[in-house]
Design a protein with these regions (language model features):
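Rhodanese-like catalytic fold shared by cysteine-dependent sulfurtransferases
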Residues: 1-24, 30-62, 67-117
């Protein structure tokens, strides 16, 4: 039996699950985009660094991978599943979140990027 396809969440479902604490948003965009605006409480893990930093990814919740527009997350979800992580992807990415008018925090508001060990 093949690996299940990515669980795509629309922004309303993602927001509800984030607020309930069932998801942790992992922002795959680069540092300038992350600093400029992101989903509140999200953790920065730029796509190019993700494989070398799996051990720093918090576990215990489903990881919601977020990119600019949802076009790059499927491959990252496959890599994360191979590491035994439970994952989902935000349909439409950060653009859809922003366009829906949902809360956004900036670097001065929230969490710093995930640091290298």
């Amino acid at each position: 039996m093949s690996e299940p396809s990515v669980e795509w969440l629309d922004v309303a479902a993602a927001r509800e699950r984030l607020e309930a604490g069932a998801l942790l948003a992992i922002d795959l965009r680069g540092p300038p985009d992350y600093a400029g605006g992101r989903i509140p409480g999200s953790v920065s893990l730029p796509g190019r660094a993700i494989e070398s930093r799996w051990k720093k990814v918090p576990t215990g919740r489903t990881l919601l991978f977020v990119d600019d527009d949802g076009s790059r997350v499927e491959a990252v979800c496959a890599l994360a599943r191979a590491q035994g992580l439970v994952v989902a992807a935000l349909r439409g990415g950060f653009e859809a979140w922003f366009d829906a008018g949902y809360p956004v925090e900036t670097m001065s508001d929230g969490l710093p990027p995930l640091e290298d060990a």
